């Protein structure tokens, strides 16, 4: 028979670790992290570092804002917690009574009625928005591919020029520059120089990466803001390439005005 001497159980416990975090907490952390990263970009990086650094930071910020909240990063080192475990004396054999009744089985915890309704509705709405966003992106890419097949292609070395009368606004996608009719002389050269800058810096690949993340985190307004800022950096970098090539600023502004280049990048 044991004498009831208390025992000691030691177990490491890490502060801030409470198991898997809830979806709501993860969403809040995603919003906080993405907002913090974009605030840092706006305050400390815009017009202070190169266009390349701005592009890389914005793309990395979009991915990190989704990855960092998913990590279980401890804020404090693990500490050892001592739990006293009293040893209970065994009862005498003659006082032991055996029960024949069965203990009731523990049933599943049924959530409240509104939770049973709200959870599938929220999941269904989220997945619907994701599939729609990815579907629209796929349709746009398929449309660009079909347009390329119908266009007259010219190998220009660093890029492929696709010309078609139905192209209203010049744009570039991956290694292809799309150009409509009516572009001759220096106007044509300036527009091609602008679009060649997008191809050279692989702007389309960055836009596609951000679009994919935005399709999964469509509820995050900061991802949409990051995409718009990234597009602005792309345009600034392409503009700088045109001016560095020796074209006059006033002439370039005139060409851009009549070309309506605010929509020059579609993807």
Q: How does the language model describe each region?
A:
Residues 20-33, 47, 171-172, 182, ...:
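Membrane-anchoring hydrophobic segments
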Residues 201-231:
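A Zn2+-metalloprotease active-site environment signal
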Residues 41, 45, 68, 72, ...:
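Membrane-water interface at transmembrane helix exits
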Residues 33, 37, 131-144, 206, ...:
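Alpha-helical transmembrane segments of polytopic integral membrane proteins
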Residues 190-203, 210, 238-239:
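Active-site recognition of the HExxH zinc-binding catalytic motif
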Residues 74, 201, 225-267:
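Short helix/loop segments within enzyme catalytic domains
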Residues 1-35, 45-47, 51-135:
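Hydrophobic membrane-embedded segments
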Residues 46-49, 73, 77, 106-184, ...:
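Juxtamembrane/interface helices at transmembrane-helix boundaries
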């Amino acid at each position: 028979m044991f004498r009831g001497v208390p025992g000691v159980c030691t177990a490491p416990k890490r502060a801030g670790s409470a198991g898997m975090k809830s979806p709501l907490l993860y969403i809040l952390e995603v919003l906080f992290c993405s907002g913090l990263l974009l605030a840092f970009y706006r305050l400390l990086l815009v017009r202070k570092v190169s266009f390349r650094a701005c592009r890389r930071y914005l793309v990395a910020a979009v991915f990190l804002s989704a990855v960092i909240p998913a990590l279980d990063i401890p804020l404090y080192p693990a500490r050892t917690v001592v739990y006293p475990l009293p040893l209970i004396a065994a009862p005498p054999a003659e006082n032991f009574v055996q029960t024949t009744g069965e203990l009731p089985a523990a049933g599943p915890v049924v959530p409240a009625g509104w939770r049973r309704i709200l959870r599938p509705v929220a999941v269904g709405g989220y997945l619907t928005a994701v599939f729609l966003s990815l579907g629209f992106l796929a349709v746009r890419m398929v449309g660009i591919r079909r347009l390329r097949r119908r266009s007259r292609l010219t190998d220009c070395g660093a890029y492929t020029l696709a010309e078609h009368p139905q192209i209203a606004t010049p744009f570039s996608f991956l290694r292809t520059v799309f150009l409509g009719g009516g572009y001759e002389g220096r106007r044509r050269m300036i527009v091609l120089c602008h679009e060649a800058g997008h191809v050279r810096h692989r702007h389309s690949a960055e836009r596609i990466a951000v679009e994919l993340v935005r399709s999964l985190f469509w509820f995050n307004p900061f991802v949409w803001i990051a995409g718009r800022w990234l597009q602005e950096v792309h345009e600034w970098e392409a503009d700088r390439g045109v001016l560095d090539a020796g074209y006059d600023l006033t002439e370039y502004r005139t060409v851009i005005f009549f070309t309506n280049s605010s929509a020059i990048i579609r993807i």
